[in-house]
Amino acid sequence: LRAYARYLKQIRLGFDLGYIASTLNNHTDIARELTRLFKTRFYLARKLSAEDLEDKQQRLEQAILTALDDVQVLNEDRILRRYLDLIKATLRTNFYQPDANGQNRSYFSFKFNPHLIPELPKPVPKFEIFVYSPRVEGVHLRFGNVARGGLRWSDREEDFRTEVLGLVKAQQVKNSVIVPVGAK
């Protein structure tokens, strides 16, 4: 949940990390169900049949939506719904993949379908990967299946995604004759 909070900060949801954490603390029942949904999608998916997986996900989503009806503060409701949106928009993650020594990794990556994330700043890339660790965060935005681009260091901790999005837009224009989509 902490990694998703950092991503919410990058997509300009409008709430600071303290308020997001406070919201999760105020609604531990919903936070627990969000965590269960994440685990179902990315850990239990390897153990359940497609039908059982779909059924379990639908039940968890419905439980979360029902619990959200009792959230009285509009901003808290908005944050919790965005968590649900992010989990549903996550295509893949390395969260449950151990390192070479069988230990938990110190970093996580999430591949999103950004078109499933409401209110995302435009233009919306085709794919987005967010990397989180206590030491570093990063984002890779891609506007096509194949795209030119690379890595860039940013000292803009609060909004590096905005910087990268601007660079990708510029790269799309610059390289339109070569490859019609960009990435950073």
Predicted stretch roles:
Residues R2-K184:
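Extended, well-ordered protein cores
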